[in-house]
Regions:
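Active-site substrate-recognition segment that forms the wall
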Residues: 94-96, 127, 135-143, 230, ...
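Helical element adjacent to the flavin cofactor pocket in flavoenzyme catalytic cores
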Residues: 158, 165-168, 194-252
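Flavin (FAD/FMN) cofactor-binding and adjacent substrate-gating region
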Residues: 17-26, 31-33, 102-108, 131-212
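A non-catalytic, amphipathic alpha-helix used as a structural packing/dimerization or gating element
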Residues: 113, 117-131, 162
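Glycine-rich FAD pyrophosphate-binding loop
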Residues: 68-91
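Glycine-rich Rossmann-fold phosphate-binding loop(s) that bind the pyrophosphate
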Residues: 55-59, 81
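Glycine-rich active-site loop/strand segments that organize a redox cofactor
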Residues: 91-120
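Extreme N-terminal leader/targeting segments of oxidoreductases
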Residues: 1-51, 69-70, 74-75
Length: 325
């Protein structure tokens, strides 16, 4: 959609690209949903808790949920600076993968000795996510349809074959599909081959998952305060004191689940680099458009480039695709 001008300075948008974006809405697709729950009250005054969880994304929500399930008498409080699921947990492609190493190839390269254990734990983790969704009746549009890792360049076909050989050495029986088999699943002439991971990836509505976990926590008695930023944590005898704009919390234990927002423990800044990409979402496909695309298995799709692109269908049959700028 963009090309550089003759001097190689700022790119110029083509008329066709401009027209294609004329009716686009620059918003977060998942969070802009009519099922979004109303915000919970902010913390006002002083409270105490056995465990204080800072951050209302997936990590914080699951920490609070597991802590309460493990000990129903434990007093658990969760605070979120904005609203639950507002940041990365509500702004992603909705691929729920079993890999703990951001892909098996990455795991084989960096953790070869631990790879088998990491893969086993990752599968158990994905099973646990599905079990939690089922147990608490969370309507997160969870579809365990798997993923196609797709070669779109000749060199990627060779890389795919080598990757399959390495997986076989670790006891995995990878399913490789040639050009014709891949295009039979999704009708794209650019697809040259693929690996089909039928069970290791699920699709999910990210925001609905966060909101469902929020409700599960509330049902178990977790106190949740939204629009409550923790501005400072200090030691306080046998516990910790958390300062907020309109109140404070004294906690025996604190779990920081703040992802890239590391200011409460500044030394973490040396270990975390925020990474982002963009997604676009179409209008719902018509039956004729769905027939033209194929994709009856509703698998997640991702190409094999280092700065890869990914594609998926939503519950109402829109195509969501994303990748790095």
């Amino acid at each position: 959609g963009r090309y550089a001008n003759a001097r190689g300075s700022e790119p110029t948008w083509t008329p066709r690209a401009m027209r294609s974006l004329a009716e686009a809405e620059p918003s977060v697709f998942w969070l802009d949903d009519r099922s979004a729950p109303p915000a919970l009250p902010s913390l006002v005054g002083a409270v105490e808790a056995d465990l204080v969880v800072v951050g209302g994304g997936y990590t914080g929500l699951w920490t609070a949920l597991h802590a309460k399930e493990a000990d129903p008498d434990r007093d658990v409080t969760l605070v979120e600076a904005a609203t639950v699921g507002w940041a990365a947990s509500g702004r992603n492609g909705g691929f729920c993968a079993s890999s703990l190493t951001h892909g098996e190839a990455n795991g084989l390269d960096r953790f070869p000795d631990e790879f088998d254990t990491l893969e086993r734990l990752g599968r158990e983790n994905l099973d646990g996510i599905e079990a939690t969704i089922t147990k608490h009746g969370i309507d997160a549009e969870f579809e365990r349809t798997g993923e196609l890792d797709i070669a779109v360049e000749d060199w990627q076909v060779d890389e795919l074959n080598e990757f399959a050989r390495l997986l076989a050495e670790h006891g995995t029986d990878p399913v490789l599909l040639d050009r014709e088999q891949t295009q039979a699943l999704v009708h794209s002439p650019t697809y040259l081959a693929s690996r089909y991971d039928a069970d290791g990836v699920a699709l999910v509505h990210p925001a609905k998952l966060a909101w469902g976990l929020r409700q599960a926590c509330l049902d178990l008695g977790v106190r949740i305060y939204e629009h409550t930023e923790v501005t400072k944590i200090t030691s306080d005898g046998a516990g910790l004191a958390l300062r907020c704009p309109f109140g404070s919390i004294r906690g025996r234990q604190v779990a920081l689940a703040t992802n890239a927002f590391t200011n409460l423990l500044r030394r973490l800044g040396n270990y975390i680099v925020p990474v982002y990409d963009y997604v676009l979402v179409t209008e719902p496909l018509s039956p004729e458009q769905q027939d033209a695309v194929g994709w009856e298995g509703r698998q997640g799709l991702a190409d094999l480039g280092n700065q890869f692109h990914y594609y998926r269908l939503t519950a109402d049959n829109r195509i969501l695709w994303g990748g790095y700028d």
